[in-house]
């Protein structure tokens, strides 16, 4: 092996640590990119969970607002019906009173006329008075029957309104119960899905961390292998250096012996001359 060839081989061998450093740098960059992707994936899942939670809260609020609006409508309708019932009751009472007063006025007028006639016709006074009393009794009975019928209709109307209000309240209670049940199911589903998403994120994060550790282990093993190869190469370089130095020393010693012998021969030639 010539000195030029040995030098070139040594130069090529010494270039390999730079390749190793570059490879290790690339591996570190890949690991960093993987960690960043894992972090972005985790952040993305957390953001999706938060968006879903906000959407669920919005839907729940809409349901509650709808229930409140329905309650206001029912209360408004009840107030209107109550006011209408009071107006009808007052109108019926007013009509009955007016009718009673009108009939009474007519009866009073008739009684006055009859009395005047009876005063003028003394012979038929008793008969006319009897007839008058009978008419008064008939009219009074008619008025009482009419008043009783009006009050019965009024009570029936009031009972019907009360029954309708009770039915509306029952329907409202059933609606509230159904909404509460639906809200409970929605809440349970939201909680179940949130737990499932959190578990999925945790599992994905754990798997990513496990993969990262495996990659780090492989990289460390590769780095250890490369380091072993570097040590072997360095030992080979040191051995070649020692062998080359030994050969060079032998050459130098041989040259010195040759030069010494030449000088000795020249000295002997000079002496013989």
From Swiss-Prot:
Residues 1-19 are annotated as: Nonhelical region. The keyword Cytoplasm applies. Residues 20-273 are annotated as: Rod. GO terms for cellular component: cytoplasm; microtubule. Pfam families: SF-assemblin (PF06705). Residues 123-175, 211-263 form a coiled coil. Interacts with BOP1 (via C-terminal WD repeats). Belongs to the SF-assemblin family. Shows an alpha-helical coiled coil structure (35 repeating heptads) related to the alpha-type fibrous proteins (K-M-E-F class). Giardins are involved in parasite attachment to the intestinal mucosa and in the cytoskeletal disassembly and reassembly that marks the transition from infectious trophozoite to transmissible cyst. They may interact with other cytoskeletal proteins such as microtubules in the microribbons or crossbridges, to maintain the integrity of the ventral disk. This is Giardin subunit beta.
């Amino acid at each position: 092996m010539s000195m030029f060839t040995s030098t070139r081989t040594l130069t090529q061998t010494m270039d390999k640590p730079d390749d190793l450093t570059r490879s290790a740098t690339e591996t570190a960059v890949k690991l960093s990119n993987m960690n960043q992707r894992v972090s972005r994936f985790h952040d993305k899942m957390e953001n999706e969970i938060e968006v879903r939670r906000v959407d669920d809260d919005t839907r729940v609020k809409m349901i509650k607002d709808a229930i409140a609006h329905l309650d206001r409508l029912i209360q408004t309708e009840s107030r209107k019906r109550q006011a209408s019932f009071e107006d009808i009751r007052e109108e019926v009472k007013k009509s009955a009173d007016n009718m009673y007063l009108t009939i009474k006025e007519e009866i009073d007028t008739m009684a006055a006329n009859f009395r005047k006639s009876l005063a003028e016709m003394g012979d038929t006074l008793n008969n006319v008075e009897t007839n008058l009393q009978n008419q008064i009794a008939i009219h009074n009975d008619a008025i009482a029957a009419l008043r009783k019928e009006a009050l019965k209709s009024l009570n029936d109307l009031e009972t019907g309104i009360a029954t309708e209000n009770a039915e509306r309240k029952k329907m409202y209670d059933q609606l509230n119960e159904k909404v509460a049940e639906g809200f409970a199911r929605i809440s349970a589903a939201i909680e179940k899905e949130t737990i499932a998403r959190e578990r999925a994120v945790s599992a994905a994060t754990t798997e990513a961390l496990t993969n990262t550790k495996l990659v780090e282990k492989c990289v460390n093993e590769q780095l250890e292998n490369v380091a072993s190869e570097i040590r072997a190469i360095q030992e080979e370089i040191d051995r070649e250096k020692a062998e080359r130095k030994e050969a060079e020393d032998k050459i130098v010693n041989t040259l010195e012996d040759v030069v010494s012998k030449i000088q000795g021969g020249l000295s002997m030639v000079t002496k013989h001359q």
